[in-house]
């Protein structure tokens, strides 16, 4: 939800959620495994462990009076590892971005051919250029977002009166309130309002 709110500038106002546990057991490594160690584990390295957490969620939501959204979160989609994507549909144009192809932005038009924009800092507007450190043809992705957040955090220390360009604790609190509404909606099978309050963005 945070990405949808950040990209659109709108706020989720209400939602309806459906959560599901498709796999009641999960494979748990018998021994600790380092993250990103690329160690291949065989069937003998796991034990089946019962779980009661959801592995799939579907949420429809409203952002104000006219904007609607739909979101799925899944750990059961074969072949999808860390997929994250967003699509925004307007009256004249649509845009789509996919984390697995971070340097591309797709734009769809009603009255012209579709386009794929490839990141090239020399062609970006100044406000966007500050987020691109590498020249065109050099991919920047998920791990680069942390660098950008830390850069903006440290910059705010030297200019304390500026507007923070990174998530604040209140932004995290807002996302927790949205997730509370997701759980409440799932339990009650009803639309749930999301409390409105200002965040750091």
Kindly give the residue locations of the regions a language model identified.
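C-terminal hydrophobic helical "lid"/dimerization subdomain
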Residues: 172-184
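Beta-strand scaffold of nucleotide-dependent catalytic cores
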Residues: 16, 70-73, 97-98
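C-terminal capping/lid region of NAD(P)-dependent oxidoreductase domains
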Residues: 184-201
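C-terminal glycine/acidic-rich active-site capping loop/insertion
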Residues: 6, 20-65, 87, 92-166, ...
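Glycine-rich phosphate/pyrophosphate-binding beta-alpha loops
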Residues: 72-81, 141
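Glycine-rich Rossmann NAD(P)(H)-binding loop
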Residues: 72-76, 89-92, 195
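Active-site-adjacent "lid/gating" segments in soluble enzymes
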Residues: 1-13
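Conserved S-adenosyl-L-methionine
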Residues: 12-20
